[in-house]
Each structure stands twice: as C-alpha cells, then as structure tokens.
Swiss-Prot record:
Belongs to the formicidae venom precursor-01 superfamily. This is U-poneritoxin(01)-Om3a. It comes from the Eukaryota. It is found in: Secreted. Expressed by the venom gland. It comes from Odontomachus monticola.
Length: 80
C-alpha cells in the first residue's frame, strides 16, 4: 500500500506544526523567566533605595537628637 501525496503533505505539515509549537513554548518559558528576573532586579533596586533613604533619615534624626541634647546641656550649664 503506497501513501498518497496528500497524506504525506498532511504528515509533513502536521510534524512542522508540532515542532513549531514546541519551540515556541520553550521561547515563551524563557521570556517568562527573563521577565521574572527583571522584575526581581527592579524590586531589589526599589528596596535598596528605600533602605538607603530610611537609613539616611535615621542618621539625620540621630544627629538632630544629639545636637539637641548638646544644646540643652550647654543651656543648662549657662543657667548655673
């Protein structure tokens, strides 16, 4: 029994569709992984910048408190 040309053409097209679909699925998975990695990097930068801002604010507050304490001590010595 000899297969017809139409059956062979259908088989070739079917195999190409399967191969294209598997390659496309792998590309989508790679793109998803890349997008997730980029999102983590961006959130890391946001948290890093926020941490620096919080640290800077805390240092300024501590410096202001120390300066205020020193001024109070000097004022109390001047009153004596």
């Amino acid at each position: 029994m000899k297969p017809s040309g139409l059956a062979l053409a259908f088989l070739v097209v079917f195999m190409m569709a399967i191969m294209y679909n598997s390659v496309q699925a792998a590309a989508i998975a790679d793109a998803d992984a890349e997008a997730e990695a980029i999102a983590k990097i961006k959130w890391g930068k946001i948290f890093k910048k926020g941490g620096k801002l919080i640290g800077k604010t805390a240092l300024e507050a501590a410096a202001n408190a120390a300066a205020s304490e020193a001024i109070s001590a000097m004022a109390s010595q001047n009153e004596k």
